[in-house]
């Protein structure tokens, strides 16, 4: 009865190929996620480039503004090591997700939870995605509400206080009705590749401005940069970069770094719509997106740190506002970052809506009415949270730390350990165990830091 051991009934939710190991690996790398030959023959499906832009948009958000502060508290080499480690772990966790999708023949994070732990597993994964993405979207909209009026007022030549376009709530509602809701209504995440490419170029522009402005801010820093441009001195301790630096502030860098490459809720929907989908092709999409995001992260953090050194603000643009208050490039990059954050909202809206639909309407066929009403309901919820819960980022700090840790580290490692038929001492299972352990430690550490921060305040 050797054959029965290799059937799908061998263990609920796990498919094991009857091919030889070498042949199985090769087939797995290039096997399609879905049996969709008619689609392959047509031109439908998102291209490799648009899929890369979508993954990068899912990765990069407002967190890029805090990375220079992280470098100041860890040192250049310490930051580089942590950033590279997190990027590799994120890539490996995506690798495990894709491998499980191939072997279980499912196409969603939620269904992986179903295969691993039954209906409770599916509900837990879907609930985690919904909470994480609603928290992220609300936080992004709160940034828009608080920062966009200030950015607009800096651009205007005279005082326009009291004008409707400087009212954060009014701007937020207009933007959500005119931009966020229409983009969120799109039925396929691949359609957002064009807006994601725009968001990525905004981030690249931000990094370029940070590089250029390194030579516009004097060192040692003075509040009157115009009169001190020629007083630049690298002879003082204030202007010497630290390769390694550890202090009590350094521990706060770990949660920020750990969540720098969170894209896992969007990876599988992007995978499903990829043209000629295969595990190898989607892994290349993910690796390309992570590598480009790593490059933008590192360049902006490095030159942001080398501009302000120990005086770098927790949000990098605040430093430029203080020392270059009327600089045209800085004002432009503020608007670009805000629009980049805005264009991320529809992308992370897609997995949240999908998770909600899978919990409530999994047995129903697609309906435009149901699709539109669910989209509208989610948009109303995140707008209300952004308007009426001013400390939304603090509220979702604890929840976000735990849900992000689960989605990046815990779930991929745990599901692989549960579903895999490999020997426990195999490299993949040991890697999955390491991922699970890392997630548990990072998640617990993040929660402790957030609670201590609340107590100190």
From Swiss-Prot:
The chain crosses the membrane at residues 48-68, 70-90, 112-132, 171-191, 192-212, 251-271, 289-309, 328-348, 372-392, 395-415, 432-452. Keywords: Acetylation, Amino-acid transport, Cell membrane, Disulfide bond, Glycoprotein, Membrane, Phosphoprotein, Synapse, Transmembrane, Transmembrane helix, Transport. It is a multi-pass membrane protein. Glycans are attached at residues 234, 284. The modification Phosphoserine is found at residues 4, 7. GO terms for biological process: amino acid transmembrane transport; glutamine transport; inorganic cation transmembrane transport. GO terms for molecular function: active monoatomic ion transmembrane transporter activity; inorganic cation transmembrane transporter activity; L-glutamate transmembrane transporter activity; L-glutamine transmembrane transporter activity; monoatomic cation transmembrane transporter activity; secondary active transmembrane transporter activity. One of its GO terms (cellular component) is plasma membrane. It is found in: Cell membrane; Synapse. Its main location: membrane. Coiled coil: none annotated. The keyword 4Fe-4S does not apply. The modification N-acetylmethionine is found at residue 1. InterPro entries: AA_transpt_TM. It catalyses: L-glutamine(out) = L-glutamine(in); L-glutamate(out) = L-glutamate(in). Disulfide bonds join 219-239. It holds the Pfam family Aa_trans. Belongs to the amino acid/polyamine transporter 2 family. Amino acid transporter with an apparent selectivity for L-glutamine and L-glutamate. May facilitate glutamine uptake in excitatory neurons. The transport mechanism remains to be elucidated. This is Solute carrier family 38 member 6. It comes from Rattus norvegicus (Rat).
């Amino acid at each position: 009865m050797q054959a029965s051991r290799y059937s799908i009934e061998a263990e609920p939710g796990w498919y094991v190929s009857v091919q030889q190991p070498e042949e199985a690996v090769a087939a797995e790398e290039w096997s399609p996620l879905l049996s969709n030959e008619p689609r392959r023959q047509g031109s439908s499906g998102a291209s490799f480039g648009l899929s890369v832009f979508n993954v990068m948009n899912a990765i990069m958000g407002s967190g890029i503004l805090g990375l220079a502060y992280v470098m100041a508290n860890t040192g250049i080499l310490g930051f580089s090591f942590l950033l590279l480690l997190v990027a590799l772990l994120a890539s490996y966790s995506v690798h495990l997700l894709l491998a499980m999708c191939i072997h279980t023949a499912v196409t969603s994070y939620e269904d992986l939870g179903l295969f691993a732990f039954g209906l409770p597993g599916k509900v837990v994964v879907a609930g985690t995605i919904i909470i994480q993405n609603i928290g992220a979207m609300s936080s992004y909209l709160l940034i828009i509400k608080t920062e966009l009026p200030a950015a607009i007022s800096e651009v205007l030549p005279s005082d326009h206080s009291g004008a409707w376009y400087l009212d954060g709530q009014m701007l937020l509602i207009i933007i959500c009705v005119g931009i966020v809701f229409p983009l969120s209504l799109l039925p396929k995440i691949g359609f957002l590749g064009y807006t994601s490419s725009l968001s990525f170029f905004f981030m690249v522009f931000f990094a370029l401005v940070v590089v250029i402005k390194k030579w516009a801010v004097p060192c040692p820093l003075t509040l009157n940069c115009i009169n001190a441009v020629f007083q630049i001195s690298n002879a003082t301790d204030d202007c010497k970069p630290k390769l390694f630096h550890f202090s009590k502030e350094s521990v706060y860098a770990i949660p920020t770094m750990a969540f720098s490459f969170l894209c896992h809720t969007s990876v599988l929907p992007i995978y499903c719509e990829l043209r000629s989908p295969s595990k190898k092709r989607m892994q290349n999409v993910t690796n390309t997106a992570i590598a480009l995001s790593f490059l933008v992260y590192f360049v902006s953090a490095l030159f942001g740190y080398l501009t302000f050194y120990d005086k770098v603000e927790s949000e990098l643009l605040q430093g430029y506002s203080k020392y270059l208050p009327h600089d045209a490039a800085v004002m432009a990059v503020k608007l670009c970052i805000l629009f980049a954050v805005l264009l991320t909202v529809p992308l992370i809206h897609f997995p949240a809506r999908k998770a909600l639909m899978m919990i409530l309407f999994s047995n129903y066929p697609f309906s435009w009415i149901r699709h539109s009403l669910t989209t509208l309901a989610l948009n109303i919820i995140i707008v209300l949270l952004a308007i009426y819960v001013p400390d939304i980022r603090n509220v979702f700090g604890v929840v976000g730390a735990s849900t992000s840790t689960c989605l990046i580290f815990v779930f991929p490692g745990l599901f692989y350990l549960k579903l895999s038929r490999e020997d426990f001492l195999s490299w993949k299972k040991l890697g999955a165990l390491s991922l699970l352990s890392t997630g548990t430690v990072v998640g617990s550490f993040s929660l402790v830091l957030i609670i201590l921060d609340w107590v100190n305040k």
